Amino acid sequence: MMKSLFVTGNDTDVGKTCVTASIVKNLRDMDIDVGVMKPFASGNRKNSNSLSQDVEILMKYSGSHDPIDLVNPYFFEIPTSPYDASKILGQKISLQKITDAYDKLLLSHDLVIVEGIGGLMTPITQNYFVSNLISELDIDTIIVIGSKLGTVNHTMLTYEHCKQMHLKLKGFVINQTEPNGYELSNLKQQIMELTNQTVYCTIPYQKNFDLDLYIDNFTNFVDFSNFGFKDV
């Protein structure tokens, strides 16, 4: 039985937030009480009172009313890694704050979906990376991958690091973020053959992007029973 899931990527800008929002929306539709967490977010706020766009999306589609300091313990107003941002802004990162927030969310919900920042080797502190956080949370993981040329290399590097860290990898989601690059069925076949892992779905490119339509497409392409969520 899966109690939580960490959504990471093989690169930045591969659509982790869209995939995470799709998962939590479908879980809500299955009458599962799902919590969301994005331990680290970065970028510009829409205004002084708003959250990061990614966090707003996750809270909207999950229906979350949890305190923001649990859902998103750290927000940096510069688009860089937590390690780099904390140095630039002089803001110390407490790893205990992250794990405590996760534990509290887990007590309040059937399960928690956690969206990472960047990829597995994105630094949180000088000697602590996203992969270390996943390992410490002891949480199942899926990897969102794009479809641009070079994706297979990036995916295999990510996969090998998962094995090195003994992470509990559930499989992959292929998200076509641009019209060019790998043909989706070919990419899916390669990833399955090279990793011997599940590819849950391939989401085709959407020229005029609409998140609600994306979530509908995700629902059509994914059999959620494969995730093990129905055992919750």
Which residue stretches match the model-derived regions?
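Extreme N-terminal starter segment of soluble prokaryotic enzymes
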Residues: 1-6
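Inter-motif core of Ras-like GTPase G domains
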Residues: 125-148
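Conserved glycine(s) of the Walker
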Residues: 14-15
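Charged helix-capping and loop-helix junction motifs
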Residues: 126-132, 156-159, 184-189
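C-terminal lobe/tail of nucleotide-utilizing enzymes
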Residues: 160-232
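Residues at the beta-strand->loop junction immediately N-terminal to the Walker
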Residues: 8-10
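Phosphate-binding/switch loop-helix module in NTP-utilizing enzymes
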Residues: 81-124, 131
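N-terminal phosphate/diphosphate-binding loop that engages ATP/GTP or pyrophosphate donors
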Residues: 18-92, 103-104
